[in-house]
Amino acid sequence: VNALKTPVPVINVPQTVTIVTDEDIRKQGFRQIGDIVRYTPGVNTSQGEGHRDAVVFRGVRSTADFYLDGMRDDVQYYRSLYNLEQVEILRGPNALLFGRGGTGGIINRVTKKATVGEVFGSVDAGFDSFGAFDVAGDYNMATGNNSALRINFHTDDLANHRDFYYGVRVGFNPTLKVLVSDATTLDLSYEYADHERFIDRGIPTADGEPVERFEKIVFGDEDQKLQTLTANIMRA
């Protein structure tokens, strides 16, 4: 588990832990955090006002308990999965480790790092009946006896069952690993993210069900009600 900022055996983590690997993500066709959470006991998804990840840890809603390689990542957006080695979901008291504002759980994304001495690559593509599709690539190459470069990229079209809904996500993440000495490893990472989507907050409900006569109605201006994200993220 990497959520504690250093690799820790699962048996030594003082919370309940669920780990979803890159292989699991690819086999199940997960495209966002909400897809993973649906298969995790004790955790549910919340709407997030149609423009951000929102998770309910054991009954407590949170939009801030997200981490990236052990560092807080509480920006309000939908997180991509294309460059992840695994997703770690911790449930239980965590104020001592993650701050007194913790809700009783966190989600930590562990990114892929370059692998020295190996060359490999893969391309994945998918689509659904609503017209959505995604393409992702992962390529690792040795750049020397003690260094390697790895590049991950993806593009998503986010069409769904709502006729007026649309969205696009693009991500590019090169990483460099250098073995400085037997005791020192340097990992450098740059990530570019460009997201745009319509903010769909759903339709009104009555008696616990959506009001059918509103299912074709757009609540908001289709040209103005947009979420955009452009980010340049550097890690070392």
Residue ranges and their predicted role:
Residues 23, 71, 126, 156-158, ...:
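Short strand-loop junctions, especially beta-strand C-caps/beta-turns
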